[in-house]
Regions:
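Mid-length scaffold segments of soluble, non-membrane domains
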Residues: 61-116
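N-terminal export/membrane-targeting signals
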Residues: 1-5
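Primarily secretory-pathway and cell-envelope proteins
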Residues: 6-56, 108-178
């Protein structure tokens, strides 16, 4: 199974005021890489950690709110040690305490619509059977609290980095454009 090509960002827009649409992109050697997500805010909630957190340890998070977070790449990538062919994917994070794993999933659609990030019971829509793979992220404590989720891409030459910043956490993973 391969990823569906050319997801349309306008199909992912919800007009949500609580978790506004956000995007990060980088161009490497003429190839576009972008991530589209909905950015929730902390709003005096405990986001990560123990059982009282919105995203407790040991859960899978959709890396945002509303629709599942989407990665588009015009080039083959190696994210840390994970080979990612050009195409479109959904991104999740396995929150295992102080060590997160980035999940790259091949499922983009639920029937005729883009996949929502969670089910009605609050569990994730990530399906392990359709995962391309998982790779470790480098964790650090944020220098100061980050109120609204921020995902960013940066690159120098063919090497780049994806950075996730939210609440008191930063998580990053390197990538190489093939």
């Amino acid at each position: 199974m391969t990823a569906i090509a050319q997801v349309k960002k306008e199909d992912l827009k919800t007009g949500s005021k609580k978790s506004p649409e956000a995007e990060t992109s980088v161009t490497v050697n003429g190839k576009n890489i972008w991530i589209f997500y909905h950015a929730p805010s902390v709003n005096n909630r405990k986001i990560f950690g123990g059982k009282d957190a919105l995203q407790p340890d040991g859960t899978v998070w959709r890396l945002g709110a509303d629709y599942a977070t989407v990665l588009h790449t015009d080039a083959d990538l190696t994210i840390n040690d994970l080979k990612v062919p050009k195409g479109d994917y959904t991104l999740y994070a396995d929150l295992d305490g102080g060590q997160w794993k980035l999940i790259v999933n091949k499922t983009l659609m639920d029937g005729a619509r883009h996949i929502w990030g969670i089910k009605m019971d609050g569990s994730t829509t990530n399906n392990p059977a359709t995962e391309l793979g998982r790779t470790s992220m480098t964790m650090a404590k944020a220098g100061s609290p980050v109120e609204t989720l921020k995902i960013s891409l940066s690159a120098t030459g063919a090497k780049g980095k994806m950075l996730v910043e939210f609440e008191k956490v930063t998580a990053s993973v390197p990538f190489t454009v093939q």
